[in-house]
Amino acid sequence: MSKLNFSKRIKVVTVDDSPIITQRIKSMLSEMENIELLGSATNAVSALSLIHKQIPNVVILDINLDENSSQFNGIDLLIALRSRYPQMKIIMLTNLSAPQYRMRCIAFGANYFFDKSNDFYKLPEALNEIATATVPSV
């Protein structure tokens, strides 16, 4: 078994239309070792552009995004990212925590699904799991 190669740093992009949540994530990430926040986006279009330029290891993604800028939501973005970047880790962080959203996101390839209100504290643990994950040697 070999560790995933994150070049010693996990590179993260956040996608959320709430400035408060984005700031909470930034604050949390700033306290973690080996995490580099590459940038944040509020809608799917700007997120795709940022992600294509930066190629993060991890995307922290909300379902509801800025509807004024795009007709794509976080699930649409999840599908697009999963098809283009199958190795990228995607953490869904949303207030839409009903089972049907969780099932859809997991079915479309999300690695984690967290409720913003109840599970925010789980983000560091998920990032740590990603950093220390092992995969079979090829």
Language-model features, listed with the residues they occupy:
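Acidic, metal-coordinating helix/loop segments flanking the phosphotransfer/catalytic sites
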Residues: 40-58
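Alpha4 helix (beta4-alpha4-beta5 surface) of REC/receiver domains from two-component response regulators
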Residues: 72, 76, 97-114, 118
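Short amphipathic alpha-helix used as the core "switch/output" element in two-component signaling
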Residues: 70-86
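Non-catalytic signal-transmission and effector/linker regions of two-component phosphorelay proteins
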Residues: 1-11, 19-21, 121-138
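Negatively charged, flexible loop motifs adjacent to catalytic sites
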Residues: 20, 43, 96-100
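Two-component/phosphorelay signaling modules centered on CheY-like receiver
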Residues: 19-39
